[in-house]
């Protein structure tokens, strides 16, 4: 018979971490996976206006100038705010309906044809109803 082998004892891990890539950095997609969902939930909870006030007021004044033949009208801040609230509510409702059409078509991306069909279904006025 030959010499007996020593039984192997499991090695202990060092108490300090070994330098090298961490486990989290090896999977960068895991963290970004639900960022879009987190952003959607944050925006749904908020009641803030999403359009900037100054560019919106410029567009309102430009459109108003076309209808009044160049006469510059003064707008109250509350009137602009009410108009912006209505415009954002209209756009949110439009995109909700367009997204339903997108899901019906078996897609997740809204195409211009979805917006056009939404407006056509709503009719000429196309209000919030």
Swiss-Prot record:
Region called H3-like, residue ranges: 30-129
PTM (free text): Trimethylated by NTMT1 at the N-terminal glycine after cleavage of Met-1. Methylation is low before incorporation into nucleosomes and increases with cell cycle progression, with the highest levels in mitotic nucleosomes.
Region (CATD): 64-105
GO molecular function: DNA binding; protein heterodimerization activity; structural constituent of chromatin
Keyword check for Transmembrane: no
Keyword DNA-binding: yes
GO biological process, one term: protein localization to chromosome, centromeric region
Disulfide links within the chain: none
Locations listed in the record: Nucleus; Chromosome, Centromere
Basic residues: bias regions: 1-14
Keyword list, A-Z: ADP-ribosylation, Centromere, Chromosome, DNA-binding, Methylation, Nucleosome core, Nucleus, Phosphoprotein
Positions bearing N,N,N-trimethylglycine: 2
SMART domains in the record: H3
GO cellular component annotations of the record: CENP-A containing nucleosome; condensed chromosome, centromeric region; nucleoplasm; pericentric heterochromatin
InterPro entries in alphabetical order: Histone-fold, Histone_H2A/H2B/H3, Histone_H3/CENP-A
Region feature (Disordered): 1-30
Modification sites for Phosphoserine: 16, 22, 57
Record-linked PANTHER family: CENTROMERE PROTEIN A, HISTONE H3.2
Function: Histone H3-like nucleosomal protein that is specifically found in centromeric nucleosomes. Replaces conventional H3 in the nucleosome core of centromeric chromatin that serves as an assembly site for the inner kinetochore. The presence of CENPA subtly modifies the nucleosome structure and the way DNA is wrapped around the nucleosome and gives rise to protruding DNA ends that are less well-ordered and rigid compared to nucleosomes containing histone H3. May serve as an epigenetic mark that propagates centromere identity through replication and cell division.
Subunit structure: Component of centromeric nucleosomes, where DNA is wrapped around a histone octamer core. The octamer contains two molecules each of H2A, H2B, CENPA and H4 assembled in one CENPA-H4 heterotetramer and two H2A-H2B heterodimers. CENPA modulates the DNA-binding characteristics of nucleosomes so that protruding DNA ends have higher flexibility than in nucleosomes containing conventional histone H3. Inhibits binding of histone H1 to nucleosomes, since histone H1 binds preferentially to rigid DNA linkers that protrude from nucleosomes.
Family label: Belongs to the histone H3 family.
Entry remark concerning the domains of this protein: The CATD (CENPA targeting domain) region is responsible for the more compact structure of nucleosomes containing CENPA. It is necessary and sufficient to mediate the localization into centromeres.
Protein name per Swiss-Prot or TrEMBL: Histone H3-like centromeric protein A
Species this chain originates from: Cricetulus griseus
């Amino acid at each position: 018979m030959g010499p007996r082998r020593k039984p192997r004892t499991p090695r202990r891990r060092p108490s300090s971490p070994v330098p090298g890539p961490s486990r989290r950095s090896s999977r960068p997609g895991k963290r970004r996976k639900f960022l879009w969902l987190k952003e959607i939930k944050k925006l749904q909870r908020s009641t803030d206006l999403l359009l900037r006030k100054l560019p919106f007021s410029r567009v309102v004044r430009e459109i108003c100038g076309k209808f009044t033949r160049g006469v510059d009208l003064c707008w109250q801040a509350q009137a602009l705010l009410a108009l912006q609230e209505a415009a954002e509510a209209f756009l949110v409702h439009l995109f909700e309906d367009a997204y339903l059409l997108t899901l019906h078509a078996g897609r997740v991306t809204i195409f211009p044809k979805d917006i056009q069909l939404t407006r056509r279904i709503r009719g000429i006025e196309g209000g919030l109803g």
